[in-house]
């Protein structure tokens, strides 16, 4: 994101729309920054927020819903409450990237994820059915 912003600012400077100034945020760490990252940990994507995500629900909610892709009830809850995920696609594509890692497995766990989402969002079975219908339409584009 910084590179995109830098390029945009430099373009504006080059056409005399902005005056050149020293960058004020060059050393600013991104939200969730962590100095030492354990890349093998599937929770590494949360950086310094990892422990908050893990403790967001109960300790039993840190067990993955799948053996193939990593997604927990705590991640689902965190994504809804702190990242404004509202649809099954939001969770399985945008927040966890599960759909890109294993589309078939994402399809298999989608009902569990939708049920947990409905519980958190206080939605009914009709909402779950609609989300699953939309997701099953989408997933066809990812399963080879």
For the regions a protein language model found, what residue spans apply to each?
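C-terminal accessory subdomains/tails of enzymes that are appended
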Residues: 1-144
């Amino acid at each position: 994101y910084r590179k995109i912003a830098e390029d945009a600012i430099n373009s504006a400077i080059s056409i005399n729309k902005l005056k050149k100034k020293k960058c004020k945020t060059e050393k600013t760490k991104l939200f969730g920054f962590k100095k030492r990252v354990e890349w093998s940990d599937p929770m590494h994507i949360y950086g310094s927020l990892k422990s908050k995500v893990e403790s967001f629900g109960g300790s039993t909610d840190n067990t993955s819903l799948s053996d193939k892709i990593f997604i927990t009830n705590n991640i689902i809850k965190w994504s809804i409450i702190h990242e404004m995920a509202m649809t099954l696609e939001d969770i399985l594509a945008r927040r966890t990237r599960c759909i890109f890692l294993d589309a078939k497995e994402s399809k298999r766990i989608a009902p569990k994820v939708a049920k947990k989402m409905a519980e958190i969002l206080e939605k009914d079975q009709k909402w779950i059915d609609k989300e699953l219908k939309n997701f099953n339409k989408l997933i066809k584009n990812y399963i080879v």
